[in-house]
Amino acid sequence: MKRAYKDLQEFIQVLEAEGELLRIQKEVDPELEISEIYLRHAKEKDGGKAILFENVKGSDIPVLINAFGSYKRLSLAFGAHSLEDFMNELKSLVQIEIPEGFWGTMKKGWQIKDVLKYPPKRLNSRSASCQQVIYRGDEVDLSKIPVIKCWPDDGGPFVTLPLVFTKSLDGKKKNMGLYRMQVYDKNTTGMHWQMHKDGSHFHGEYRKASKRMEVAVAIGADPASVYCGTAPLPPGVYEMFFSGFLRGSGAEMVKCVSVDLEVP
């Protein structure tokens, strides 16, 4: 039922083979124009198609949008024959309530055993595609990334689908969440994590201890990992375990260059 996409590029190839991808080669502006084109296209029957903007003003990096904007594309993203059956399976997992106490946890353990069968796999950094090009210090320039501004009254451009990786102060808990990031300048962003999110809870621990918190961000990950950034999982279940479950194979991770965290 499940298929493990190695990366976003492989998913794009499947979308194109299924007639679900529209390529735009004309130059487009990341400030308002991309979001306007998407908004009009998404109103078409069945949510239109996924759009790949290949020529974005000011950047050499293409932008994919509307990749999950229809039932068919969601089915393709998870390799599911029946999206309804697949979503019912997910619902049974994310609604699990983990009781207090050892025996209560043991009784419920069977319900999440399938999720825990697929732990992340740590790869050698030399084989990591996300570290083929590395910028350090003054080389860092976020304007190289085509971050879009969606609405006229937005405070600026926002990274809207970042996978944000953090860990607790004692290092025993990990979190991957999808939190919007406003780009302020070439090497500074804001982080919008709500008070009830794990990333915010971890940040509170570090602030109370007067310590800096390490954060890693992945952009353009595989479909399963992107979904898991928003999944309402049971307490204590690391999102990348769930990503492995959806993929049917442990998510491949690599240690970051400048922080003690791992990313896809």
Regions found by a protein language model. Name each.
Residues 1-264:
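Extended, highly charged
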